[in-house]
């Protein structure tokens, strides 16, 4: 048993609190009168509180401060890479070994298991005097120790009190191995963020020193955690990000959907959380822009959407001579493959390699029928379900709508095609339809043969999903080379701004109306040889991801899209 030296403090209102033995050699005597910082008079009484030393089972998982998991062992395990082990001293004086699932630098790992845990972790950082907040915190701690010692065993026979520190906030009750990590966790309830970035014009604040350290790397560009895969050169700011990335190589999907009958699993808890909202219908993030009000299932999609209104593109390619800007980090991350020939992602079924995980996922869906989820695909599938439910609720039968099918997968990644351009190809590999890039830098291009083969209108859906662009039937003479203006048509039939379609051989001036494409962020919906292709761009996702979403929806059942035909077509 470990003795914790405490003094009871009887406040002037008759209540009792606890303070730790004074620091800096100062003695507190029985019956001594002290004055707290708020002017309250208190009286000192000596007490001793017994606290059980923490016990750990061999192989018990522990949570690191960056949120990743490790495992604790009494002795080193045979077959473990020495670089994945780290020796720590437990509170009882014994030595244990922390095993990380992936190798990380030991000097940058902050463990949830610490060598010494004292009440100073809960006191104010200023050692001089006692603040009212410190007395309250110490009172809570003393009652917590006494309470945890009386916690009964649960149904599995595991003593919950072994982890010692339980969150007292209503509806939470999470347990932690150290007082320090309980304190860090409680900041999620209080909103306290004591660690502030001192970079000019930043000022962001964080609940932990590790969070601040990871954030500073966004300013410095430091990425100390490198992927151990031989053909992969990626590096990351945190060990948690590296751990998530490694799962793209191993195929590990540890986070399962809790809904009965679903059975899907995911590489990260955040993707699972977004997926669960497709079951519940929750959309907690709402756009504050007047007349918009769109809701989103994830904070990432919400922030990316807001940048549509602000025009902000904060992510810049640092490769000399490039300088392209993007509204979201994932687009910049995927853009980097344009500057490298590395293809680190391998299909576990056929062995084909790809530069991007999204391209690999599209290949798996098309070639092998395997479904993988991303935040964006879950968002789009949810919206598709909502549209289908709304159509089913209509009393009158819906108008005839063309069926949608996917022509073919992207057969090959070509080095001369920018990463953000998705191409639909024929079986012989010849390009059939080229799609606009996410940043709008490349125009929509259709060959005369494609236009002649159109059996119905082509529709383009705006970012808001409320308007469609309709090209009239082939008798409108769109098969000729040049530029043709068509009109954006809203759901109620109101004509909005014109958009220019570029056919083969046309040269477009920088100040032409094709510039509107750069702001509309549209995806191409086309028909060819009687078969419809449908790709809708949602929430600033890339066209490649949009194709993934459409393919997944088609494989789950018949998917249709209602097209709006313009009366005049121009």
Curated annotation (Swiss-Prot):
Region (3 X 12 AA approximate repeats): 34-99
Keyword Glycosyltransferase: no
Pfam families: zf-C2H2
Membrane-crossing residue ranges in chain numbering: none
SMART domains: ZnF_C2H2
Domain of life where this protein originates: Eukaryota
Ranges for the Sequence repeats: 34-45, 62-73, 88-99
Region of interest: Disordered: 365-401
Keywords: DNA-binding, Isopeptide bond, Metal-binding, Nucleus, Repeat, Transcription, Transcription regulation, Ubl conjugation, Zinc, Zinc-finger
Species of origin: Homo sapiens (Human)
Gene symbol of the encoding locus: ZNF76
Classification of source organism: Eukaryota, Metazoa, Chordata, Craniata, Vertebrata
Cross-link position per record: Glycyl lysine isopeptide (Lys-Gly) (interchain with G-Cter in SUMO2): 24
Protein name: Zinc finger protein 76
Compositional bias per record (Low complexity), positions renumbered to this chain: 379-395
GO molecular function: DNA-binding transcription activator activity, RNA polymerase II-specific; DNA-binding transcription factor activity, RNA polymerase II-specific; RNA polymerase II cis-regulatory region sequence-specific DNA binding; sequence-specific DNA binding; sequence-specific double-stranded DNA binding; zinc ion binding
GO BP annotations, alphabetical order: positive regulation of transcription by RNA polymerase II; regulation of transcription by RNA polymerase II; regulation of transcription by RNA polymerase III
Subcellular localization: Nucleus
Tissue specificity field: Testis.
Function: May be involved in transcriptional regulation.
Zinc finger map (C2H2-type): 165-189, 195-219, 225-249, 255-279, 285-309, 315-339, 345-368
One term under GO cellular component: nucleus
Similarity field: Belongs to the krueppel C2H2-type zinc-finger protein family.
């Amino acid at each position: 048993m470990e003795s914790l030296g405490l003094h009871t403090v009887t406040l002037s209102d008759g209540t009792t609190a606890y303070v730790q033995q004074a620091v800096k050699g100062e003695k507190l005597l029985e019956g001594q009168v002290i004055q707290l910082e708020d002017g309250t008079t208190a009286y000192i009484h000596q007490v001793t509180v017994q606290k059980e030393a923490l016990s750990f089972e061999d192989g018990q998982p522990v949570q690191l401060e960056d949120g990743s998991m490790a495992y604790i062992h009494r002795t080193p395990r045979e077959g473990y890479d020495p670089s994945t082990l780290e020796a720590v001293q437990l509170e009882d004086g014994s030595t244990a070994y922390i095993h990380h699932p992936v190798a990380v630098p030991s000097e940058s790992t902050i463990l949830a298991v610490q060598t010494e845990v004292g009440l100073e972790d809960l006191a104010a950082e200023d050692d001089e005097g006692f603040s009212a907040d410190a007395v309250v915190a110490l009172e809570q701690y003393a009652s917590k120790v006494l309470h945890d010692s009386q916690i009964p065993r649960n149904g599995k026979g595991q003593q919950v009190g072994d982890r010692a520190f339980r969150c007292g906030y209503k509806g939470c009750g999470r347990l932690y191995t150290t007082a320090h990590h309980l304190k860090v966790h409680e900041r999620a309830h209080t909103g306290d963020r004591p660690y502030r970035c001192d970079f000019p014009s930043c000022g962001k604040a964080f609940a932990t020193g590790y969070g601040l350290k990871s954030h500073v790397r966004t300013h410095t560009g430091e990425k100390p955690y490198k992927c151990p895969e031989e053909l992969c050169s990626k590096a990351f700011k945190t060990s948690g990000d590296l751990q998530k990335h490694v799962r793209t190589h191993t195929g590990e999907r540890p986070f399962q959907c809790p809904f009965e009958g679903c059975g899907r699993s995911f590489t990260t808890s955040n993707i699972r959380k977004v997926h669960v909202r497709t079951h519940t219908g929750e959309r907690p993030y709402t756009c504050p822009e007047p007349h918009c009000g769109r809701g989103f299932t994830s904070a990432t999609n919400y922030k990316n959407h807001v940048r549509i209104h602000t025009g902000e593109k904060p992510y810049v390619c640092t490769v000399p001579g490039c300088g392209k800007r993007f509204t979201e980090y994932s687009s910049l991350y995927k853009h980097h493959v344009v500057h490298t020939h590395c293809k680190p992602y391998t299909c576990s079924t056929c062995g084909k390699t790809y530069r991007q995980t999204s391209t690999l996922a599209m290949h798996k869906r098309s070639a092998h029928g395997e479904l993988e989820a991303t935040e964006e695909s879950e968002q789009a599938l949810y919206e598709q379900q909502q549209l289908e439910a709304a159509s089913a609720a209509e009393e009158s039968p819906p108008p005839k709508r063309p069926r949608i099918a996917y022509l073919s997968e992207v057969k090959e990644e070509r080095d001369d095609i920018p990463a953000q351009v998705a191409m639909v190809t024929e079986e012989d590999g010849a390009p059939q339809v080229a799609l606009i890039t996410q940043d709008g830098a490349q125009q929509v291009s259709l060959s005369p043969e494609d236009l002649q083969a159109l059996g119905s209108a082509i529709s383009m859906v705006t970012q808001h999903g409320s308007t469609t662009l309709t090209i009239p039937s082939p008798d409108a003479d769109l098969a000729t080379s040049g530029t043709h203006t068509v009109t954006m048509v809203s759901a109620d039939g109101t004509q909005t701004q014109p958009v220019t379609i570029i056919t083969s051989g046309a040269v477009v001036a920088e100040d032409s109306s094709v510039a509107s494409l750069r702001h509309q962020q549209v995806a191409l919906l086309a028909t060819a040889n009687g078969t419809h292709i449908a790709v809708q761009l949602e929430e600033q996702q890339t066209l490649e991801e949009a194709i993934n979403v459409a393919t997944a929806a088609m494989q789950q059942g018949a998917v249709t899209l209602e097209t709006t035909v313009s009366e005049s077509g121009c």
